[in-house]
């Protein structure tokens, strides 16, 4: 197994470690969750970079790298729903609509549905001996998801070790989280729609 593929596989293990930390009763569980998720993000950056530099791109990596990303980010969003049961104070009011820096269930439904649709398309392509690689705008989507998740984790972990940081984040931290979540939602839906449109011949010919 090549080094990039080992890094990709390690992301599955780091995702499991992240979920354990999220739901453990350790006094530093938020910090551990943040560390594990950041390490998983580093492997996502390194596996692609090393594969391109050393010309170690394989069909395994093309398929499993985006799958590892999807499992990592979707697991994190679902876990954050479980953790953030109480809605924080809203930071923006639009008439009767109040927006809070929280991962809502309907957001995760959209994100997971998009990822399942793209995974289904890749499986359909594989059945036709076609390998669909991740595209640049898909990577931008993944980065935006990671930024939103890390922002939420930092807000939680700061209460364990850095009370001064939590106090410093209060004026603008919730605004950043809210913006990151909505940017993530926009990139997730738009990139998914564009990917399905560009590869429409794969599924339209079977309709």
Which sequence ranges carry the predicted segments?
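C-terminal membrane-associated helical module and adjoining short loops/tails
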Residues: 1-5, 14-15, 34-37, 41, ...
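Juxtamembrane "helix exit" motif at the C-terminal ends of alpha-helical transmembrane segments
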Residues: 81-89, 157-159
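Hydrophobic alpha-helical interface/terminus motif in multipass membrane transporters
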Residues: 51, 77-81, 121-125, 196-199
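Intrinsically disordered, low-complexity domain-flanking/linker segments in eukaryotic proteins
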Residues: 87-99, 164-169
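Hydrophobic alpha-helical transmembrane segments of integral membrane proteins
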Residues: 1, 12, 62-65
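Cytoplasmic juxtamembrane interface segments
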Residues: 11, 109-132
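Core segments of transmembrane alpha-helices
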Residues: 10-17, 68-80, 114-119, 141-153
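Membrane-embedded alpha-helical segments that form the functional core of polytopic membrane enzymes
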Residues: 16-63, 74-84, 95-112, 172-189
């Amino acid at each position: 197994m090549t080094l990039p593929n080992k890094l990709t596989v390690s992301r599955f293990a780091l995702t499991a470690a992240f979920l354990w930390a999220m739901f453990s009763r350790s006094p530093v569980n938020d910090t551990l969750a943040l560390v594990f998720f950041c390490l998983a993000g580093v492997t996502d950056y390194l596996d692609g970079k090393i594969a391109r530099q050393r010309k170690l791109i394989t069909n395994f990596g093309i398929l499993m790298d985006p799958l590892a990303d999807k499992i990592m980010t979707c697991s994190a969003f679902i876990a954050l729903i479980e953790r953030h049961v109480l809605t924080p104070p809203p930071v923006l009011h639009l008439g009767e609509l109040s927006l809070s820096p929280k991962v809502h269930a309907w957001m995760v439904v959209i994100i997971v549905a998009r990822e399942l649709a793209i995974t289904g398309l890749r499986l359909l392509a594989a059945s036709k001996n076609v390998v669909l690689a991740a595209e640049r705008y898909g990577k931008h989507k993944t980065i935006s998801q990671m930024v939103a998740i890390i922002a939420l984790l930092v807000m939680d972990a700061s209460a364990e070790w850095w009370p001064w940081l939590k106090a410093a984040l209060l004026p603008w931290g919730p605004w950043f989280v809210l913006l990151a979540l909505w940017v993530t939602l926009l990139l997730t839906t738009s990139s998914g729609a564009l990917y399905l449109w560009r590869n429409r011949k794969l599924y339209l010919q079977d309709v």
